Amino acid sequence: MVAYSTPSSSLHKPSPYNESRRMARFRPSNILGDPFALATISISILAWVIAFISSIVSAINARGYPTYSWWGVAYSLCIILGMTAVFGTDTGSVYGVAIVGYLSAGMVITTLGVNSLVYRSDSASQAAGAGFILMSMVIVIWIFYFGSTPQASHRGFIDSFALQKEHPGAYGNGRPMSTAFGNRPETTSSQAPQMYTSAQLNGFETSSPVSGYPGGAPGSENRSSSQPRFGNPSNANLTANGNENEVPQPTEYPYRAKAIYSYDANPEDANEISFTKHEILEVSDVSGRWWQARKSNGDTGIAPSNYLILL
């Protein structure tokens, strides 16, 4: 029988969403300090109350009330509670795709409720249909907001009024986050590469080295390689003798970026920096996977681009 040992961390792909593994804390100030969140949630609650009370009155006084509309009332309540949690925990950028999916289903349900109620003769059913119409309008606004990237101009304009969110300097000139996985600045290390025996690899060894990954297989924990991983090393990193030096620190940081997740620097790599969620960093170059950044306290280093959003 094959004995399974504890999986090595080098065999697992690191997740860029470490922040999402911890339950986000609900803060009422995220809603009270955001006019968009406060207004849309308040209007949706008002719309739901109108639809709910009118549905009760219509079901009591009139015959043939469409039972399907009760599912629309229940689903609308779930949407309101879910959106309140999203705004309160400020996790819209994390669950944006799921939010749009649930809102799209709610749009269909409320629209069917409008079609089955607004054309009835009794005033209570018409009032319930009006509540569903108002709820549908709020859902359309939410879909347009969460269905857009954080770099969208209209979303930056809306977020600029919130007290708990950073205000982009020029929301009309928002730039999308770079998806080009270019060269990471190379670092030097005096440590020898870690070697594994056949027993430690436990069947994962190969007869030839992995092509295209000098210095080890992809996912290796040793991130301080003396050989370039992608392409040729920059001439700025080479001395006259051909030896590789530390990455020179830039003097200008023309870009500003906001951290959408917290990041803890690798203790084995002195060139990385740690930062917290919503922290603003100054960035010198945005062309690669790792950006040279500077914090407000003057600390400089490299930061993963998928943790940052350009302002």
Swiss-Prot record:
Locate the SH3 domain: which residues?
252-311
The stretches that face the Extracellular side, renumbered to this chain, are: 57-67, 115-126
What are the alphabetically sorted keywords of the record? Answer: Cell membrane, Membrane, SH3 domain, Stress response, Transmembrane, Transmembrane helix
Which cellular components does GO assign to this protein?
A: plasma membrane
Principal location class: membrane
Mode of membrane association: Multi-pass membrane protein
Where found, per UniProt? Cell membrane
Record-linked SMART domains: SH3
Q: Where is the composition biased (Polar residues)?
A: 221-248
Task: Report the superkingdom from the record.
Answer: Eukaryota
Q: What Pfam families does the record tag this protein with?
A: SH3_1 (PF00018)
Q: Where is this region: Disordered?
A: 172-191, 207-251
Membrane-spanning parts: 36-56, 68-88, 94-114, 127-147
Q: Which residues lie on this side of the membrane: Cytoplasmic?
A: 1-35, 89-93, 148-311
Enumerate the InterPro entries for this protein.
Answer: SH3-like_dom_sf (IPR036028), SH3_domain (IPR001452), Sho1_SH3 (IPR035522)
Q: Does the entry feature the keyword Transmembrane, yes or no?
A: yes
Disulphide bridges in this chain?
A: none
Q: How does it assemble?
A: Forms homooligomers.
Q: So what does this one do?
A: Plasma membrane osmosensor that activates the high osmolarity glycerol (HOG) MAPK signaling pathway in response to high osmolarity.
Similarity section = Belongs to the SHO1 family.
Q: What is the protein's name according to its record? A: High osmolarity signaling protein sho1
Name the gene that codes for it.
sho1
